Amino acid sequence: MSPNMSLTASHPQQPQPTPQSKAQLTRQACNRCHASKLKCLRPPGVTTSKSCIRCIKADTECVYDPPQRFGRPRQKSRPQPESVPPRIEAREPEVTDPRRARHGSTIGARWESSERESNGSLAPSSAAESPYTAAESPDNRSSAAVAAAPLVGMDYASSHFPEPLESERTSELLDAFQSESMQLDVDSYWGETDPVMPPAATVPYSDLLTGPIDLDFTVSDQDDRAKIPKHALDPALSGADTGSTADDYVLDLVQLQASVNQNNRELAAMIRKAQSALGMSDGRVGQALPIPDSQFKTHLQRNLKASEQTLDVLHRINSQFAPVSRETRPPSRSYGLDPTLDRLYADCVSQDHAFGVGGDELGVRATTPPGVSAADPQHSILAFLVLTTYLRLLHNFDALISILQDRLRCSASLDPRRPLHLSEDISASDSSSNPLLDVSLGSFSFSSSSARSLQAMLNVQMINTVLTKIKSSTQRMLLGPDYLPPSSCSSSASTSSTASTTSCSTRAPPSSATGGAHHPATAGSIFFHHAHSHSHSSSDHLFSQPEGRGYAPYNHAFHPPPPSRHTHNYPTPETITPPSSVLGGVSGTTPPPFVSGVDHVVRRALTEVQELELSLRNRARAIQQWSEEGF
């Protein structure tokens, strides 16, 4: 008999642990053999010896201690259970569908019924050699049983799994999700049919995208323009140094828009929480929203960082898809693009621009870069992502500026010109309600509470700068590098073509509505179109915000604020009819449904962009006037 056989025979059998009594586990090797990492052998032919050979030779006690690590018990020497149905039956209540299990039916009963049904049409061996029989091995199944298995599974799936939800119930769930989520406001624009085509003589979107020529770069030479290196956007985004395609930019913008949307959700949650806390308080007149200064700074920095990344993407798009060279450059004024919508966005982001001279002549067309197709819907998505990202940034900055406006209004309660009966309940300056917004210029920072309005003004100027650059870069991407906005072509209206005159006069700058003079230096600013006009009329002191958006009208004079506050909910705009100058024509060709749908969404997004820019401009002018007057 070999030592291994004698070891197996002489090893004391451990009793099987039961739920009632669990035996203490011991090592199979004694302590001395375990410490020496040697095999623990019993004397051959002796079955009652509890000491191993080494302990007998050393004349020491053979001690077996419990194992220090309790692992999974070995299954080789233990007999397998004869059947497993009790374990399966114990788990059946957890997986039984309550809507399908009638009259006490279970999964096992359904399988038995399906097998009985299959036995009537299949070979007799298929029932005995079912793939779900535990006693049979998968290798021993016959071909008939293998062929029968899919039928059994299909029968089970058709009889057990629940049917899809009804269409009405699904619609209710989608509506509930849409109402609770803080997604893009243009999400509900999809599905609206029959967008009207723009006329051939109209510049697409020119009456909605009003603003300056791109301020990003100063181009001195055509050859240097093609040598602008592509730099990485962010470590989390595309970081390759090679030339990017439209797909790469779409991926960058999708990731960037997800970050901006997350900022929007957190900002909206912070405002709702502050409004709830303010509603539970005494509601004293002049009390600001209890938003900590640290949270405000965090959200401001996040959105400024997202704006920087947006500018980076637009810079790379405009640098890569810009025309490399042209024999002649057309005049810097409005021009007409191909109105066919399946070519619109491809023309905007590629080199294939058509410059209108005198309304009839066409300028020189540059060659389309490799890999750019005029009918590629990827360019429609690219334009859509750029505009909706800019729209969400407008939402976020509008909320941040409204917080600044709210704090300045509450700071006005400490002004000596304010009536005493309105400020008698106002305590001293509180850092939690009127904190100093630590704005620093190099090594200099403001430390006086009297400079609070100036600090807020610097924040507004910084937001204005980044949004203006994003808008001008977006115009450069959509309408070409030589696009001159209608607001800046009023001086040459007499010499421009009919189409140019129409596009220049379609939508006047907001300054004309209030009587302020149009200043050339501020024509490109989103916020301050007539910031240098100091003749404040009664209409300049009260800026009414667009109705239905939750904005409270604000009075520059020191009067008690209205009871309603900035809720910053983003309701979907009602049916917005775009200007007739854009949608007043019918094109001869019908665009693809996908591109036509994107065009309709973009038009509605542009209308909401214009509304938000007006709200931001009114708030910024209020803060600017406070900064100039002081308090």
From Swiss-Prot:
The keyword Transcription applies. One of its GO terms (molecular function) is sequence-specific DNA binding. One of its GO terms (cellular component) is nucleus. Disruption phenotype: Abolishes the production of acurin A. Pfam families: Zn_clus. PROSITE patterns: ZN2_CY6_FUNGAL_1, ZN2_CY6_FUNGAL_2. Residues 1-28, 64-141, 489-522, 536-573 are annotated as: Disordered. SMART domains: GAL4. Residues 88-99 have a biased composition (Basic and acidic residues). GO terms for biological process: positive regulation of transcription by RNA polymerase II. Its main location: nucleus. Residues 30-62 bind DNA. Residues 1-11, 119-128 have a biased composition (Polar residues). Keywords: DNA-binding, Metal-binding, Nucleus, Transcription, Transcription regulation, Zinc. It is found in: Nucleus. PANTHER family: THIAMINE REPRESSIBLE GENES REGULATORY PROTEIN THI5, ZN(II)2CYS6 TRANSCRIPTION FACTOR (EUROFUNG). Transcription factor that positively regulates the expression of the cluster that mediates the biosynthesis of acurin A, a highly reduced polyketide coupled to a serine via a peptide bond. This is Acurin A biosynthesis cluster transcription regulator.
